[in-house]
UniProtKB/Swiss-Prot annotation:
Active-site residues, Swiss-Prot/TrEMBL: K15, D140
The protein, known as: 4-diphosphocytidyl-2-C-methyl-D-erythritol kinase
Class of this enzyme: transferase
Top-level taxonomic group: Bacteria
Residues binding ATP, per UniProt: P98, T99, G100, A101, G102, L103, G104, G105, G106, S107, S108
Tagged with keyword Transferase: yes
Record lineage: Bacteria, Pseudomonadati, Pseudomonadota, Betaproteobacteria, Neisseriales
GO BP of this protein: isopentenyl diphosphate biosynthetic process, methylerythritol 4-phosphate pathway; terpenoid biosynthetic process
Catalytic activity line of the entry: 4-CDP-2-C-methyl-D-erythritol + ATP = 4-CDP-2-C-methyl-D-erythritol 2-phosphate + ADP + H(+)
Gene: ispE
Keyword entries, A-Z: ATP-binding, Isoprene biosynthesis, Kinase, Nucleotide-binding, Transferase
EC number: 2.7.1.148
Amino acid sequence: MNIADGRQAFPAPAKLNLDLRITGRREDGYHNIESIFCLIDLQDTVYLKPRDDGKIILHNPVGGIPQEADLSYRAASLLQKYARNLAGVEIWLDKKIPTGAGLGGGSSDAATVLLVLNRWWQCGLTQWQLIDLGAALGADVPFFIFGKNAFASGIGKKLIGMDIPKQWYVIVKPPVHVSTAKIFTYEGLTRDSASSIMPTFQNLQPFRNDMQAVVFKEYPEVWKAYSELSKYGSAMMTGSGACIFAAFQARNSAYNIYRQVSGLYEAYLAEGLSKHPLLSV
């Protein structure tokens, strides 16, 4: 969508981890994971306006983060060296995905910047080259560049497309910010889950999140949200938290539960997607 001042609008959808297992710790300190990533229609909007002077300007950094530390700014900076001309861009973020929630909002914004600017700046990078570039920004960025529901392994760069049944999700966000670094360094964190031999949606059930027990112990508010949503369905934490979600087959069922919990928590009703909206642009 074009705006009167020359900006163009691009979607940046959120994700849920329907299953998340930690299969080991690497020599570099990072962890190997296996996870089912699912796109949902809760999304930010990234507004971009091209410049021809090489400047990258982020007009509204999120949460007081310095411009140079924002993932969207860093994404443009990383890609700029591949541009054919003196390429620049102005960036605005319309945030609808809550931060510190395990929904991948910042990573999705960065992926959208990479996908669009790769075309605008005529960088010519393939999808897998963009995935390698995005991995330097964060473990969730490769999935959003991949652009469809997937089984991810390793540090998030190994991606296999996965068919996920159409579902609706009720998501609640407790009033707390979970430190991902704190959870990954927790001594009692499960780090030895067995790797999946045949990773299909059916074979991986029952789903679980290896970080959930530690987060519940360290952040009681997340446990309370889980307990509340569990009254209505099979609830689970996404990512390292803090959001809790439950899946439903019918929109009406999900909507009724959403109404129940929205008076207690910041809550969202979201539909699962099969592919990134940018794949249709």
